[in-house]
């Protein structure tokens, strides 16, 4: 349940999931429906909270036992730039699916913002929570 992440609900492994964070991943990409957004790349900021169990990696010190945030950051940035999405909603769903392809990721919160899209706002964006 989505609210479980907020309430600290115990998962099937008897404790709340750990979190791997990717904060303020910034890329310039074509994203939006307005004509000017289709020709001029704009700044896009991506934030991921990946819910997982970090204990196996802590014990083994093997990157294969956790979410490789460097690799995932690169993949999410590439997806954003190459996708030339019309809607943020489509992008966040694809980034969530990409994240959940990793075998240790149990759930993810994806937030994508466009800081320059609305001049009177600090940013506009979409945030979703998805789980396996």
Tell me what each language-model feature is.
Residues 2-132:
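N-terminal, polar/charged subdomain of small-to-medium soluble alpha/beta proteins
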């Amino acid at each position: 349940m989505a609210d479980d992440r907020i309430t600290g609900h115990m998962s099937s492994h008897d404790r709340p999931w750990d979190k791997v964070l990717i904060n303020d991943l910034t890329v310039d990409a074509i994203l939006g429906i307005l004509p000017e957004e289709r020709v001029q790349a704009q700044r896009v900021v991506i934030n991921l909270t990946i819910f997982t169990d970090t204990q196996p990696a802590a014990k083994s010190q093997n990157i294969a036992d956790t979410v490789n945030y460097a690799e995932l950051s690169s993949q999410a940035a590439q997806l954003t730039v190459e996708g030339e999405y019309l809607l943020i909603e489509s992008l966040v769903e694809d980034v969530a699916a990409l994240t959940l392809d990793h075998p240790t990721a149990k759930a993810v919160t994806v937030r994508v913002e466009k800081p320059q899209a609305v001049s009177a706002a600090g940013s506009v964006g979409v945030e979703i929570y998805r789980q396996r």
